[in-house]
């Protein structure tokens, strides 16, 4: 009844619901990480701390199992390729769309947002048919997986960079142009430094999405050499998985968290000095 009397107030049960959600989301991950360091093959009973499944076991550990190593390397390869292509292309598209005011600009903006709302299974099937029937000379494998991941990660870069463009406004560009700076100097010495926080953040998001992706990557996979960590975990989960899979997932998780942490500190550094950067660029 108190909530009905004041519907705009914060419900008292909201902190409890939030805590339960966080607990439900985090606990399974913590348990999976914990059993990656279990000395036994058991996934239910703890028998002591060990690095056996990372490098100690000479046949089943991540360090000694070629299949686990190959999945991790291929996952990181796809993530690096996706970031290297999606981020520059997304920044270019964001700059172009932000300045395009002609006919059809609204339709293009809607098309750029479609990958964000399209179910992954629909996108995966569509891309599979595309590579099998139209671009069959490319075939399935690393190239198809990279193109597939770029297809849905590109929109994230465009949205984040355009948001940054809207927030900084056109004033810095106009001031640089008024001071006689040529267009390439305005772009590389004024605009891109101001966009660097959004570019870094979008790169981190694309990296995490690439490592996490399963559906599109699974549909576009070729032979065993194009297996990723998520695909390997899914294929092994229904069998008799060893804690080495927990170790593999833990490594992938810490790589992602380490990347996000690094980007966060770099972002703080850029964001903290963005005004000084812009002023210095204008003075030059």
Give the location of each predicted region.
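Transmembrane-helix boundary motif in ABC transporter permease subunits
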Residues: 1-7, 80-112, 125, 129-133, ...
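C-terminal transmembrane helix and the adjacent membrane-cytosol boundary/short C-terminal tail
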Residues: 2, 7-8, 13-16, 104, ...
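Membrane-interfacial helix termini and adjacent extracytoplasmic/periplasmic loops
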Residues: 3-4, 42, 51, 104, ...
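Interhelical loop and adjacent transmembrane-helix boundary motif
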Residues: 4-10, 41, 48, 53-66, ...
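Membrane-helix interface segments
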Residues: 12, 99-108, 137-142, 183, ...
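Transmembrane alpha-helices
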Residues: 16-29, 150, 158-161, 168-170, ...
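A structural signal for multi-pass alpha-helical bundles of membrane permease subunits
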Residues: 26-41, 74, 124-136, 204-210, ...
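Hydrophobic positions within alpha-helical transmembrane segments of bacterial inner-membrane proteins
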Residues: 29, 79, 83-91, 95, ...
